[in-house]
């Protein structure tokens, strides 16, 4: 995953134990119930450049999002659930790192947090209808707990 250089050295990879996802969903749902605010999109690790207006605010590190909004106890439970679910994770230091052939940093994303799972963070109840998100079980069973308390 990490054999390329510069702009082409772009990868996150995870191996997930799917049998652990129900416990993870329960832990994240409880964390969202404990949250006093919606995680700030500008404060959570994104995996798309904020300059990319087509895809920004869609791909966030799950654990970093939870840690930014939930109680410490709820975040610790999610961290344990992530550890149980993520068998392997790795990431390059940047996504689309600028280099001699790509001297701009418009799309460059520094990866500071990578728990192995990403999430979409709706900023309001209305965001649940964006791109069919409300049709996903994760949206209705887990993410909706940010707003339906």
Locate the predicted segments by residue:
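Terminal, contiguous helix-loop blocks that mediate binding/assembly
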Residues: 1-149
């Amino acid at each position: 995953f990490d054999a390329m250089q510069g702009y082409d050295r772009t990868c996150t990879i995870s191996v997930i134990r799917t049998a652990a996802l129900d416990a993870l969903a329960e832990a994240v749902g409880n964390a969202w119930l404990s949250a006093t605010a919606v995680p700030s999109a500008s404060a959570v690790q994104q995996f798309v450049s904020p300059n990319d207006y087509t895809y920004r605010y869609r791909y966030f590190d799950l654990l970093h999002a939870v840690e930014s909004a939930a109680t410490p106890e709820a975040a610790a439970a999610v961290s344990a659930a992530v550890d149980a679910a993520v068998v392997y994770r790795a990431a390059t230091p940047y996504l689309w790192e600028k280099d001699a052939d790509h001297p701009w940093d418009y799309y460059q994303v520094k990866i500071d947090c990578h728990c192995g799972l990403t999430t979409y963070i709706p900023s309001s109840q209305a965001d649940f209808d964006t791109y069919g998100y409300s049709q996903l079980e994760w949206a209705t069973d887990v993410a909706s707990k940010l707003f339906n308390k």
